[in-house]
């Protein structure tokens, strides 16, 4: 029996994001071959989104861009976008990511776990810096956003940006895996 190939397209060329989408889909569809590729997709929001709302919109914009740019003969089965952002909540500043998944005419949205941020990091973000650059400076690393991310640094490697995205993607897939029971909306 020939294995089914599931084509996925990720709205980024960042290997962390492509790997997260690939791992999540491989877990959800273990009998299938996952054919993943990435493409640059604009978020339409600031390079460092500073609100929950902007972060969510950035993920949605990226997934829609991927769907619009894909050629008929190379269309993917699923489109993924991950947008990392920060916000200041009642308990303090934190970083998180939104996940947008396009499948046929459906759009699924999810959000990752949050990581509390030190106030000094948040202040640098308010001043216009990106989280990856701030973390690189603080921890003397290079291009951490394409590795373990702030999550890896602040948890001493017990969690990573990729593991956080992978879990969020699996959870966001629930409506697409169970369309009959998710048919009703709020």
From Swiss-Prot:
List the catalysed reactions: XTP + H2O = XDP + phosphate + H(+); ITP + H2O = IDP + phosphate + H(+)
Give one Pfam family, short name only: NTPase_I-T
Kindly give the Gene3D superfamilies that the UniProt entry links to this protein: 3.90.950.10
> Which chain regions cross the lipid bilayer?
none
Q: Which InterPro entries match?
A: ITPase-like_fam, Non_canon_purine_NTPase, NTPase/PRRC1, YjjX_NTPase
Q: Which residues bind Mg(2+)?
A: 75
Q: Per the record's keyword annotation, is Metal-binding included, yes or no?
A: yes
Q: What is its EC number?
A: 3.6.1.73
Query: Cofactor binding mode, per the note?
Result: Binds 1 divalent metal cation per subunit; can use either Mg(2+) or Mn(2+).
| Needed co-factor(s) | Mg(2+); Mn(2+)
UniProtKB keywords? Hydrolase, Magnesium, Manganese, Metal-binding, Nucleotide metabolism, Nucleotide-binding
GO BP: any one term: thiamine metabolic process
| GO molecular function, a single term | ITPase activity
Could you say which enzyme class this protein belongs to?
hydrolase
What NCBIfam families does the record point to? inosine/xanthosine triphosphatase, PRK05074.1
What does the UniProt record say this protein does? Phosphatase that hydrolyzes non-canonical purine nucleotides such as XTP and ITP to their respective diphosphate derivatives. Probably excludes non-canonical purines from DNA/RNA precursor pool, thus preventing their incorporation into DNA/RNA and avoiding chromosomal lesions.
Q: Which PANTHER family match?
A: NON-CANONICAL PURINE NTP PHOSPHATASE_PRRC1 DOMAIN-CONTAINING PROTEIN (PTHR34699:SF2), PTHR34699
**Family label:** Belongs to the YjjX NTPase family.
Q: How does it assemble?
A: Homodimer.
Name of the protein described by the UniProt record: Inosine/xanthosine triphosphatase
Q: Which organism is it from?
A: Shewanella baltica (strain OS195)
């Amino acid at each position: 029996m020939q294995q089914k190939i599931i084509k996925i397209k990720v709205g980024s060329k960042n290997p962390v994001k492509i790997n997260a989408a690939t791992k999540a889909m491989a877990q959800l569809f273990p009998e299938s071959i996952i054919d993943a590729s990435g493409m640059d997709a604009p978020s339409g929001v600031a390079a460092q989104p500073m609100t929950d709302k902007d972060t969510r919109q950035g993920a949605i914009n990226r997934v829609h861009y991927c769907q619009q740019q894909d050629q008929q003969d190379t269309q993917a089965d699923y489109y993924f976008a991950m947008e990392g952002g920060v916000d200041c909540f009642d308990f303090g500043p934190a970083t998180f990511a939104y996940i947008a998944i396009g499948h046929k005419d459906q759009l699924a949205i999810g959000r990752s776990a949050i990581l509390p941020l030190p106030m000094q990091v948040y202040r640098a973000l308010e001043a216009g810096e990106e989280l990856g650059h701030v973390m690189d400076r603080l921890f003397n690393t290079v291009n951490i956003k394409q590795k373990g991310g702030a999550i890896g640094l602040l948890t001493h490697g017990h969690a990573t940006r990729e593991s956080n995205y992978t879990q969020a993607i699996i959870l966001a897939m629930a409506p697409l895996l169970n369309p009959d029971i998710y048919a009703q909306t709020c």
